[in-house]
Amino acid sequence: APDYILCDESVHDDLVLALQKNISQFFVEGVDAAKKDYCSIANEHHFNRLKDALANALSDGATLVCGGETSKEGLHLTPAVLTDVNYNNSIMKEEIFGPILPIIKVQSLDESINYVNENEKPLALYLFSNKPAVHSEVLKKTSSGGMVINDCVLHHMNPNLPFGGINNSGVGSYHGKFGFDAFSHHKAVLKSSSISPFKVMLPPY
């Protein structure tokens, strides 16, 4: 799941409304009624980690605009959407690995690019724009493990594309031949002929 959204202020409110509408439709009868269609958090440790991260962000000034409901039984947490998140809060500095989505309001494309570049390189960058010039600029000025334009996660489903991170988000790639190469050792073997270059490289000259 994406760790955060950098959203232009001109469409911020529309995005929040759209997320509220879609999440409320899925959980119209609450999280317990939706459990058969919605997976739980992997274990209690990560469930508590996510609850603590959410509580910490809220205590640091963030606003919960929808979601964040926990099930009475099991380890279910509805997708929590946050606004007004402090840039320096830990939820913006670590990979969340859970259904919590902070939305950061930005005033320009440059501000978004600068934020991405000032933090750890992401496993994936998802860009939503209908402007080819914006596509090119973000592609040239940012570094990420992968990039998808106007969608999410689809590159992970294509066996012909390498999937992997860069720096802290991962090393190497897998899928198809990329995975075979990543888990293979390319052994260098050189057999020198009788005409060795060292004959002219070593003294006496």
Name these PLM-found stretches.
Residues 9-121:
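NAD(P)-dependent aldehyde/semialdehyde dehydrogenase
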Residues 5-6:
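Short internal beta-strands
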Residues 69, 76-205:
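Conserved C-terminal structural/oligomerization subdomain of aldehyde/semialdehyde dehydrogenase
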